[in-house]
């Protein structure tokens, strides 16, 4: 028994390759895009890093900024949010590492 892989199998192909069309995504308005959670988390962590002087929050804010930058969909709005989060994160790191030390808690 031999199987033929010639033109007969391509004619009987149930997938119909001649009817295939490339996928073209529909344009989505910037207001309808989903929320950029990593950018929002980066802003929150950056602000808490500056206000409460937590180094880990500032470092995590930089990581979330990088993630948000990699997944950026809307250039104008997302870039504003990422730049603000990055500014807070860098400001928190500068004040933590170069600023005056925190007063020690008395026991």
From Swiss-Prot:
Pfam families reported in the protein's UniProt record: ASTER
GO molecular function, one term: protein folding chaperone
Any one GO biological process: protein insertion into ER membrane
Keywords: Membrane, Transmembrane, Transmembrane helix
GO cellular component, one term: endoplasmic reticulum membrane
Source organism, top-level taxon: Eukaryota
Principal place of residence: membrane
Name of protein: Protein Asterix
Membrane topology label: Single-pass membrane protein
Family label: Belongs to the Asterix family.
Subcellular location: Membrane
Biased composition (Polar residues): 1-15
InterPro entries per record: ASTER
Region Disordered, residue ranges: 1-25
Transmembrane segments: 82-98
């Amino acid at each position: 028994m031999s199987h033929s892989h010639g033109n007969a199998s391509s004619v009987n192909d149930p997938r119909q390759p001649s009817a295939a069309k490339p996928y073209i995504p529909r344009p989505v308005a910037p207001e309808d895009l989903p929320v950029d959670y990593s950018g929002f988390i980066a802003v929150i962590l950056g602000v808490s890093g500056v206000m409460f002087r937590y180094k880990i929050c500032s470092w995590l804010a930089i990581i979330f900024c990088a993630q948000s930058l990699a997944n950026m969909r809307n250039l104008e709005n997302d870039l504003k949010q990422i730049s603000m989060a990055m500014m807070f994160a860098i400001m928190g790191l500068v004040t933590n590492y170069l600023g005056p030390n925190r007063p020690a808690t008395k026991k």
